[in-house]
Amino acid sequence: MDRNAVLYGVLEHRLPKWVELSDDTDLEPFFFSSVRYITAGSEDAIMIQALNLNTDEIVVFLVTNLNFMALIPTVYIENPGIRQLIASTPISYRSPITVFNGDLKKWMDCDLFVFGTMAAQKAFIKAGNSVLGSLGGNVYTYGDHVSNFDGNTPVLQNNLMCSHVYYTRYKTDVYAPWEFYYDQKRDQGYLMSLPAIIPRCKREGAFDIETIVHENAMDQDLNCQKFFKSEFRSMEESQVLIQRFREAGVTGLPPSPFVGITQKLHEIVSISLVVCNYHKTGPKKKEYYVYYNTKKMENPMEMIPVEHLHLDASRIKFEACKNEFYMLLAFINRLRKSVNVLYVYNAQFDIQVIQQRLRYYAFKQRAPRCCKGHDDIPHEWGKALMEKWEAFLSVKPQLFKAQILMGQDILKANYLKLLEGIGSVLAQAKSTMAKMCTIKERIDSYRKMKDTVQNFKSHGFGCDIIDMMYVCKRKEFEAKDGSLNTVAQLIIKKFKPHKATPKIHKMDDITYDKLDGYYRAGGTKIAECLIYNLIDSLLVIRIAKNLKPMEEYIYRQLACYNIDTAAHTRGVMNFCGFIQSTKVVEVSRNKARLDAGIVMATDYIRNSLFTPETIPRRGGFVMAPLTGLFFARPTQCFELCLDFTSMYPSMMCDLNISPETIVDSDKTNRVGDYMGYDWSKIDQGFEKFTLVLRVDRTDPENPKLVRHTSDTSLSLKRYLRLRTEHKRALKQSSGSVAEYHNRLQNEMKICTNTHYGVSEHTCSLMITTQGQHKIKLVNEFIKTLNRTGHSLFPNYGDTDSTMLYHPSDESETQLEDMVTLEDEMRAELREYMLKKLSAELVNRVKEKTKRTDTFVQSFLSDVETVLFDDMVEKLRLFSQGEVIEPFKDGGTWWVVDPLTGIWMDCSTPFSSELICKLEYENASSIGCHVAKKMYLSLVHELNNGEIINTKIKKRGMTGFKSSRFGATESITNDFMDLIFNGGALVKTGHLEALKPVTWAKLSAPADILHFSEPPVYENGICLNMNSITLIPHRVTAVTRLPCPDIKGGELVYVDLHESTSGKSSVLVLVLADGCALNHIFSSANVLHRELSFETIAMFRAFFVGAGFLDPNSIVFYERIPRLKPEFLSKITNYELFTGKKLKIPFVTLHKRKTTIQAIVKEDKKQIDYPEEWIKQDPAMAMFRRYPIDLRLERMIMDYFGSGLKCTLATFTPPKYTVSGERSRHSIVIKNHVDKHYLNDNSKFLAHVVMDRAMPTTCYIHDDIDVKAMIQSVISRVVRMIQDTQVRLQELSAAGNKLFHMFFNQLPPEMNNLDISFKYNPLVDHALQGQKGVPGLQYGNPEQIYTDMITEMTALLPRIGHMVEFMEWSQELSSSKTLCLLLPKIARDLNVPPLVTSLNDDTGNAMLIAFAHKIYIATAMLHILHGENLETHDLGPQTGTGVVGEPPKHCTGAQLREWFIDLQKTLALDAPSTHCAGCADFWLTHGSDPNFIEKMYRVNGGVFVRKIKKICL
């Protein structure tokens, strides 16, 4: 608590002393690195691990004589029961004190009682409430009785805060709180060097384990069935219950958490550990340890070269251990010696397995000869090993036993409760329908709980385990899959772009089906595995070094007064800090109560003044936007964004929204001398008040109103005040001091915003309801304004912000931004013309921004008065049973005090601490609203009318999310580069034949697309629109000069030459922070942007349809438990093994059978559709060229949204219902077209075409038949959009035709004539010359082929561990064969043509890229050579080599061919059956002489098999 708090004054002698120490003090400084509240015997204590900042010695303090408090109102002190209670209770200290009763809203005199233990406090409270209950009274505390179980509150109340510096004299005895000294200035001085303190007390390290993958490869000595049943009893119980419930008709059961790789016994074969030693000086501080189990190794380990991995072999300390037990022992001993912050990636596996193995060795219920592992390792040894682990997690395990909470364990416990609950419901004597309804409610409740479960939490003492998998889960690090390899590359490269490649990704993956063999073989094989294991630990530590989680952890502790408990997010939430949100607010509010003297009742609140609301939570107000693309070109205007600063936190302060300030409307007679805000006066309000002001009668003759405080407002204001102080200090500091202030100001912001998220239900309702009210009030005020003859209106609003267009200036004229050069023009004249034009263009930009800023300042001044008056007029004074309204006089709000008749000023005390204000955020000169919470804007931050910052703001657009798919990212980037940044299309001869390049990045020489003729405008209409095209222009020079009149400004002069006409010209561009501003003064510039985007869209349509887009963008990842067994079984047929993977990659085929049939051109009876047929392994699908679905409909949606309403047969053109002046506004017309003709979520191309088809003016001219003109505009817009969509679809279909000329092979499980998963080149159409191969729209096939060969050559060394190249032979073709290269491709790559997989990492981006380039190179050869393509001599059709099920549907000829193939297979030396089902079938029916008659019926010449299910 603060030193100026009343409570501190009362307890000063029992708390650490606030002092200002001199330099010659004999006290030593200690940094409290870990703090725990414990009970030691009969005493409560605070245990502190501390770093002596003078000596670097780490010590442990045990602090007793603590302070636990309870208060009894003085009016009850003489009650006999209370007197007896006081006499019989051990009380450490007693004192009178005046506090504020947060429940009854009044100040009261109390007696403060201090106890040495929490048990004594609780016993006193319980007994006191028993006595006072009949009298209508309560025992009170400062709120700690609701939150003291985690240790935060005892630590807070005794002022011994974690991660702060205290002074004391060291001793070995126990301490009392008052033996510590706190010097705030010195504490802050030390904390400014926090990065230097952390390594001295936090010894960081990272580890990773490797286990035996296949259960049948495990050491059978470790197979103890008694331990297995004990460990997985719950799993077996759940399986039995699930089966029983399904038989009883229960549906919709959520997936069981008793699945996954942790739900089995494991054998750890190696553990790698990297010890950072950041506290040491000099190079090579890190120590590398690798512990490995030699028990089953056939040969000693032989080291392999590691220099290419940037590793120094001499620094790696390998420790061979004779079995798993000794390996764990060596590992834990090293942890205890060198590490107290342990990083791991996916603790749910690594830590879970470590603890499983420790439980195995410490298993007490073992029986004689239950397993050899238990015979070899006595129980006492196992118990001692477990104790060592516990001593690592807590340096004082005898006083504080550490806890590790796993999300999966919580889920399992709750899942079992769900199943038990369902069982009890089924046993009830109710109707089946009633039971099923109850069961559904329980299932829904479980599903909601599942999303909020704490994922991982480490609660030790002097030790933290940090799971970097959760720490990395942030918006700024969105990765397609959460693997360590993917995340490490993303993060390390982001922070260290020049980091050596081997240091940012895992070692080349070792195939999971070979991993066990490598470990057992020993030699160089195990060396590979051990280095692989070590690199995983190194990646984890490198991620941690960049993200600095310990700094983040401690800064959050400093901000919110929490002790060190590392929680790792909940459910699927992104990481937002180690301290739980509830703790951030809870502890801060506790501190506010201690500082302000606010107390709370500890039992049922008697005489409560408010009843909690029960209606559902509300969200913020989101106004449906006026959708469409807009430019602030001549006669059009900027979109202004106004927002409330920290809206929710500031409203909580302004209106004092907190549980202890709420009073029901019918109970105001019990609250005197307060002024409350009447919540019933706003829409969707409540019959409640919050106390905002109180009457100060210090001078009885002159009462006045002052602000009333609450614990919430105090907590929030503290965060807001400290953030302001840190931001101010940040501007005046540098280096580590600046880092300190910057980190803390950001922490204060996060903690401030957290208050709303964890607020009580009634408070939450008040906050969001008031937020809606404010935004709607501002929007209504905007509608009352009329500027430059035009009425204003809001066009979008979201929660705390509103957007509107500032008044347009219809007198604005177009400016030319291009100078045509005459052949004989002198350099001096050219320079003069360009200089004059540049000045004119820049001045136009400045004039427009100045007008915008002038309007905004005037508007804000007016709206501030409206908002203030709206709040104050709803205040009511409670006095003498009356409810008195305020009134306004002379610009000030007053209320009359009924006791004295004095006018009391309401305005001054209310406004003095007012925080929530509407402010000018930015102005957008380009914007596109697509739907609610979905928009892109080119925003400019203005200061005194001048641009000081320009950037693109994006909200809710899929192209920037991890859910983006296919071409979405490319299309979004095209939109940004061409429409928002401003740029041109550069022509290349390569695969990416048209490439958007912003003007900021354009260089000479280059060929760009520009106008075939200059646009001519009249009354906002481009007269020559139909004749304008974009044609190549040669960029001969690009000159760049600074533009000092615009911050971040640049003038760019682009010299263009058009070869057909021979004309030369210079394009002048005004840039701000790399974004072109020419649209502000030139509609021609806008047209160029739009035509460029339409052109690239048409190019993308063919490009994406032809499958030229990076195929990694269509690879999905799914968690293994969510994948059906059929898919997992299918990929094992390719000899792929899932191993320890958390997620499996896949691509999807076309969904419709008819589409597949049309692509593969096979009889539909030959095509089967097994379960999960649509999912395919990425590598197999890409190399073998299955009919992959490129999701072209997704591309169409990115361009046009979900579909055009106006093309439906039932469509009727709607009436244009907007009337008045607004009906002529361009954005209103666009919104009408979008909503009624297009769809509710139309996208980029539709908006571009719409804007191009509209007049360039802000308003349709009213000197003609406006209604007819608007209808004509709408008709033209819709027609252009429809024509554009048809053209795009045609190009897409043409590209897709090319793609499916090659990607048309039928996957094995879909071909009922061939159940072998071997690669068959005879059905690969890419290996045969073809007729009618479509040509390219853009690009040179020869150049593209050469590019692909070059890129594949560069990839070959990087995929050497993934694929093997062999000479073509039918015998070498197997289920792991990927494809056969065309002869020319193989020659040009200098590799044999047959490509075979060596690896299970079939989602690897490089492998997929290699397959993609093979396809493109193959397609280019087909385009170049057609039927004359050079091919292989493949020989005759060969057999499958596998005895499988007979065809389900076939002709007589096909059945005969199948039996011939079967005969060849049976003639092999060792024929094999496809599966157990096939084997059983042939054993039963194979010798039947009437096989065909019994197995088949003939229907219309087609043989149909009678037995449907054979193959498993």
Swiss-Prot record:
GO biological process assignments: DNA replication; viral DNA genome replication
Annotated compartments: Host nucleus
Enzyme class label: transferase
InterPro entries assigned: DNA-dir_DNA_pol_B (IPR006172), DNA-dir_DNA_pol_B_CS (IPR017964), DNA-dir_DNA_pol_B_multi_dom (IPR006134), DNA/RNA_pol_sf (IPR043502), DNA_pol_palm_dom_sf (IPR023211), DNA_pol_type-B (IPR050240), RNaseH-like_sf (IPR012337), RNaseH_sf (IPR036397)
GO cellular component: host cell nucleus
Segment forming the signal sequence: none
Predominant location category: host cell
EC number, as in UniProt: 2.7.7.7
Keywords recorded for this protein, A-Z: DNA replication, DNA-binding, DNA-directed DNA polymerase, Host nucleus, Nucleotidyltransferase, Transferase, Viral DNA replication
Protein family according to the UniProt entry: Belongs to the DNA polymerase type-B family.
Protein's name in the database: DNA polymerase
Native source species: Ictalurid herpesvirus 1 (strain Auburn)
